[in-house]
Swiss-Prot record:
UniProt protein name: Trigger factor
An annotated GO BP: protein unfolding
InterPro entries: PPIase_dom_sf, Trig_fac, Trigger_fac_C, Trigger_fac_C_sf, Trigger_fac_ribosome-bd_bac, Trigger_fac_ribosome-bd_sf, Trigger_fact/SurA_dom_sf
Function of the molecule: Involved in protein export. Acts as a chaperone by maintaining the newly synthesized protein in an open conformation. Functions as a peptidyl-prolyl cis-trans isomerase.
EC number: 5.2.1.8
The entry's keywords: Cell cycle, Cell division, Chaperone, Cytoplasm, Isomerase, Rotamase
One GO MF term attached to the UniProt entry: protein folding chaperone
Transmembrane segments: none
Catalysed conversion reaction: [protein]-peptidylproline (omega=180) = [protein]-peptidylproline (omega=0)
Taxonomic classification: Bacteria, Pseudomonadati, Spirochaetota, Spirochaetia, Spirochaetales
The organism's place on the tree of life at top rank: Bacteria
HAMAP family: Trigger_factor_Tig
Length: 448
């Protein structure tokens, strides 16, 4: 069908292709559509399927030609992209440049298409790369802190007949009062539950209710400073009526061997649990170190390369980042829409982070594509066995799932990516310029 195509790269990581289709194929496609019209048209004086082509062409020539052009473009692009050196991105629809296309049966049909492709770039040598990663130490205090968190997670909330203390879980009703001590109904709140000393309640009356007992009522007067956390209350006076309806406390379990056994049957002593916590922390350090090492490596490579990110790829990734930011911070996207249109006017921090992230993704994918590592049947079997064990499923059921969903090739690709990642990390030299504590390391930044 396609006689030939002229392809060239143009700025913006775009590809321009001139595609020529043989006039013989154009005529056959036209006749095919004409025949289809003939088989369905009802024309007075003729049976269906017996209408002369000349009559059909006289009435529907423009429609048939337009449909022929549409079919030719669709079919030829499908064929072209299958063997194209520069594959199109899935973020944007290819654009036909020709404003008006017409069929001339005496000539080959030609049109020009422009589409965005993965950017072209050459990878530098990464065989002797050095990456700075801090040396991390897990101390006994880190383990004890984690143990206390586990202790709190397993605490039982029970009724407390005493008075309110810091850490008490209380349920209150409250309302603002005016100068005549009448309730301002628009400020009334009922059954408000919070932990005293750990909340961020609007009026900040945690300390004011310490010592109160269940069913007690109290009027509290509050003067808020200029720097109060909620600006609408800053430099103001409020009078509140607070009714204490319920007091509860956390019954925290004792840290002993029985506590360890309650966490997991395989733990016989508290020391077993502590060792398990330490092992988990060390595993987390290893995973985080590897992630930082790869991130830093890709970031360093990206700084040396001029990679032109396609606009559609940027927009898609930016939208994902924006949605994540909106979800985490509970901000409506409409509030940010004015600053999220294209590359212009976007918050510089967001823009820079998205570009860095995309460059790192593209570099890693290029490394994977260039790597000759193969995924064997044994590799695939090992991964399926591991997933079956982790999910507590039968191996046959895991295999059936991947086969029915046609996901085996995707799984193979993931296995290869992990193999390549392991190979990269093995060859990268790690420099430890400083030591950091476990807690600090969790939020450690490499500067990428």
């Amino acid at each position: 069908m396609i006689l030939n195509n002229d392809v060239k790269l143009i700025p913006g990581s775009k590809v321009e292709a001139v595609i020529r289709i043989s006039k013989k194929f154009v005529k056959s496609k036209y006749n095919e559509i004409l025949q289809d019209y003939s088989s369905r048209l009802k024309v007075k004086g003729f049976r269906i399927g017996k209408v002369p082509f000349s009559i059909i062409e006289g009435k529907y020539s423009d429609n048939i030609r337009a449909l022929t052009i549409e079919k030719l473009i669709h079919k030829s692009l499908e064929e072209f992209f299958k063997s194209a050196t520069y594959k199109p991105l899935g973020y944007a629809v290819p654009k036909i440049l020709d404003e008006k296309l017409e069929i001339d049966f005496s000539k080959d049909f030609e049109f020009t298409v422009v589409y965005e492709a993965y950017p072209e770039f050459e990878l530098p040598d990464i065989s002797n790369v050095e990456v700075e990663i801090p040396e991390v130490f897990v101390s006994d205090s880190d383990v004890e802190e984690e143990l206390k968190l586990l202790q709190l997670e397993n605490a039982i909330v029970v009724e407390d007949s005493g008075d309110v203390k810091s850490g008490s879980i209380v349920r209150v009703d409250f309302v603002e009062l005016d100068d005549s001590l009448s309730e301002i109904l628009t400020t009334k709140r009922q059954d408000f539950v919070f932990t005293v000393g750990e909340s961020n309640n609007y009026y900040g009356f945690d300390n004011d209710i310490i010592g109160m007992k269940k069913d007690e009522e109290k009027i509290v007067e509050k003067n808020y400073g200029m720097d109060y956390k909620f600006s609408e209350l800053a430099n103001s006076f409020k009078r509140l009526k607070i009714s204490l309806k319920d007091i509860k406390r956390r019954d925290i379990p004792k840290l002993d061997d029985d506590f360890a056994k309650d966490i997991k049957d395989s733990f016989n002593t508290l020391e077993d649990l502590k060792e398990h916590i330490r092992e988990n922390m060390l595993r987390l350090v290893k995973e985080r170190s590897e992630s930082l090492k790869l991130s830093k490596l890709l970031s360093d490579i990206a700084e040396k390369l001029n990679i032109e990110i396609p606009s559609s790829m940027f927009e898609a990734e930016f939208k994902n980042v924006l949605n994540e930011f909106s979800h985490q911070n509970k901000i409506n996207l409409e509030q940010l829409s004015n600053s999220s249109t294209g590359l212009e006017g976007i918050n510089d921090v967001f823009k820079e982070n998205v570009l860095k992230k995309l460059k790192s993704k593209l570099i890693f994918q290029k490394i994977v594509d260039n790597d000759l590592t193969e995924v064997t049947d044994s590799d695939l079997e090992d991964e399926l066995v591991k997933q079956a064990e982790d999910a507590k499923m039968k191996l046959a059921d895991i295999k059936k799932f991947y086969q029915e969903k046609n996901l085996l090739e995707i799984l193979k690709d993931e296995i290869k990516r992990q193999k390549v990642k392991d190979k990269i990390l093995k060859n990268v030299k790690e420099i430890n310029p400083k030591k950091v504590a476990f807690r600090d390391f969790i939020n450690y930044k490499t500067g990428e």
